[in-house]
């Protein structure tokens, strides 16, 4: 016997996020990609983007230009939703950190603070071996 399809299981209700004029921008810049998330004060994501979402692949994802396009994309959506000021939290050693912050500022959102929250070990785990090119 075939099971009947449950119509309620198919549709997912899109959750509404309360957008305030002040928020936070989280820039995560790894060696392989860059991810920008704009959130409200509670931490609910208003808009996000990444270099991979913008169509960059491989080594092109970790470039300042890719970070700039990703930051412009996310901040445009957040600006239309009503966000005007952000604190920027930067994490990671990647290339596009500064260009992402500049792109957020140039898209009409005022940057009030820049905070670096890159995790640094107090000599914890052994790092991967060095590349020899």
Curated annotation (Swiss-Prot):
Located on the platform of the 30S subunit, it bridges several disparate RNA helices of the 16S rRNA. Forms part of the Shine-Dalgarno cleft in the 70S ribosome. Transmembrane segments: none annotated. Part of the 30S ribosomal subunit. Interacts with proteins S7 and S18. Binds to IF-3. This is Small ribosomal subunit protein uS11. InterPro entries: Ribosomal_uS11 (IPR001971), Ribosomal_uS11_bac-type (IPR019981), Ribosomal_uS11_CS (IPR018102), Ribosomal_uS11_sf (IPR036967). Keywords: Ribonucleoprotein, Ribosomal protein, RNA-binding, rRNA-binding. Coiled coil: none annotated. GO terms for cellular component: ribonucleoprotein complex; ribosome. It comes from Christiangramia forsetii (strain DSM 17595 / CGMCC 1.15422 / KT0803) (Gramella forsetii). Pfam families: Ribosomal_S11 (PF00411). Belongs to the universal ribosomal protein uS11 family. One of its GO terms (molecular function) is structural constituent of ribosome. GO terms for biological process: translation.
